[in-house]
A protein has these predicted regions:
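Membrane-embedded transmembrane alpha-helical bundles that form the catalytic cores
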Residues: 1-435, 439, 447-481
Length: 482
């Protein structure tokens, strides 16, 4: 079950909210049991084959914390951490390791047929955070019910945001959240619709442009301009897809009176790669900083150690994202550019902000192309074809992916025949303009002040109905497989 499905929006979420607040009137304890039950159902519905591993992981980690609280033994801490890492590596990287061995040693070891538990990268990191914070004395002992809710809370279990244990557990103990809040409900509904718009209207449309290029399969068959536009399309796709999901996750929690942390802060406004990582997937950056970078010494042990720690963090980030050398190289390159930013920080003041932004944005685009590529060789091939500038022609196939049934209706309603007939690629231009305007001209949805009035209600209601009519076959979120 994903946020952009009818069953979630029109059945699961309304029933969950209604049931939670009705049960809260009688018992906060039973309301938490209800919340745990619906969260477990949500996960099982999304990926039943991996459900038992989630349960095993929860039971093992909770027992580790109980033992650690009583014995305060660092060995138990490491047993818990190693268990989580081994579980993650077993499911996510076993076949990658086999393929690598086969390539290097010319072997033919068969691949395993295991099913990757959905969201394992996220719920594994969440539980490592809980174990470490418990060892550090930052957490009180919590009931198994609270722990289950912390790990499985349905708005964030599949793709985050990653939440600090204290942030969420404190809210589970706050009985003031038992009553429905009209402000939270309005904020949540409006934020959810914004996230849904990002995913269904923007991300899924840009995804069609990206899929068009990869469907052709050979970048020699398309022009340099095509490759550049597809690269830019993926930059927009991954942002609107993942930030749209985060908006819907935060909104779903808000309607239940829970606050999840902001995950994006207009990342494409960044003036450097370091600035980008303060704005992109913020919850992952905070996790890697607190649980890896700082324990390694952070920036307090000299420049060489700082650069080494930075590279370790970005290498782990790359590995965490996926089992492919493309992700590993993507992480390494982000680490190198982050170190470069540190080295030239004093000189950057002399460079015009517009040039800083442009250099950063182009770098991010090139690295996203690597993120999307099936292999490093494919990425290099795409880059070389793009940088040859052999043709500025835009293929009709690429232009046509932006002409949708919905755009035809808009053309008819607003009489846009002149523009559509005289501007080649009119709708592609519109989508790219919307992408830039939303990324660079608007504040983050998390920071937006939502209004309660009739006009706003009508606008969001109409927008929601329009989006519902645009949902075709279920499209998977980009980070769903991470």
């Amino acid at each position: 079950m994903q946020f952009n499905t009818y069953i979630y929006m029109l059945l699961f979420l309304p029933v969950t909210i209604l049931g939670y607040f009705v049960i809260n009137k009688f018992s906060y304890f039973f309301a938490k049991i209800y919340l745990a039950a619906v969260s477990m159902f949500f996960y099982a519905y999304a990926g039943l084959p991996g459900f038992q591993w989630l349960v095993i992981s929860i039971i093992f980690n909770y027992l580790v914390v109980l033992l650690m609280k009583r014995m305060h033994n660092k060995v138990i801490l490491w047993i818990g951490i190693i268990f989580n890492i081994v579980l993650l590596f077993y499911f996510k990287y076993t076949n990658f390791a086999i393929l690598t061995i086969n390539d290097l040693l010319h072997k033919s070891i068969p691949l395993t047929k295991m099913v990757l538990p959905i969201g394992i990268s996220f719920f594994t990191f969440q539980q490592i955070a809980y174990i470490v914070d418990s060892y550090r004395g930052k957490l009180e002992e919590h009931s198994i019910l609270d722990y289950i809710n912390y790990v499985t809370f349905f708005p964030k279990i599949l793709m985050g945001p990653l939440v600090s244990p204290n942030v969420l557990l404190t809210q589970f103990h706050d009985e003031s959240k038992r009553k429905i809040s009209s402000q939270n409900m309005v904020d949540g509904i409006q934020m959810f619709i914004i996230g849904l718009f990002k995913k269904v209207i923007l991300a899924d449309t840009f995804a069609k442009a990206v899929a068009w290029a990869w469907r052709i399969g050979d970048f020699k068959q398309i022009s340099s301009m095509d490759i550049f536009l597809v690269m830019l399309a993926y930059t927009f796709q991954i942002y609107f897809d993942f930030s749209g999901y985060s908006d819907m996750a935060i909104a779903s929690a808000k309607m239940l009176n829970f606050e999840l942390p902001m995950n994006f802060d207009s990342p494409y406004k960044a003036y450097s790669i370091r600035d980008f990582w303060k704005r992109w997937h913020i919850s992952l950056t905070k996790f890697l900083t607190e649980y890896i970078y700082f324990p390694l010494g952070g920036s307090k042990k000299g420049e060489a150690r700082t650069y080494l720690n930075t590279m370790i963090v970005f290498l782990i980030s790359g590995i965490w994202h996926g089992a492919n050398w493309t992700f590993i190289l993507w992480g390494i390159l982000h680490g190198i550019f982050s170190i470069f930013d540190r080295l030239v920080e004093k000189f950057r003041k002399n460079i015009h902000p517009a040039l800083q932004w442009m250099a950063t944005f182009l770098t991010i685009n090139v690295l996203w192309l690597l993120f999307r590529a099936n292999s490093i060789g494919e990425w290099k091939h795409a880059l070389s074809q793009m940088l040859r500038f052999q043709s500025t022609t835009i293929s009709d196939g690429l232009l046509n992916v932006f002409v949708l049934p919905e755009t035809k209706v808009i053309t008819k309603v607003f009489r846009l025949y002149f523009f559509e007939g005289n501007i080649r690629g009119f709708w592609m231009l519109i989508f790219y303009l919307i992408g830039f305007i939303l990324c660079l001209g608007f504040e983050n949805a998390y920071r937006r002040k939502y209004k309660q009035n009739v006009v706003t209600a009508i606008f969001y209601a109409l927008l929601f109905v329009f989006i519902l009519t645009c949902i075709g076959s279920e499209s998977v979120f980009v980070y769903f497989n991470f």
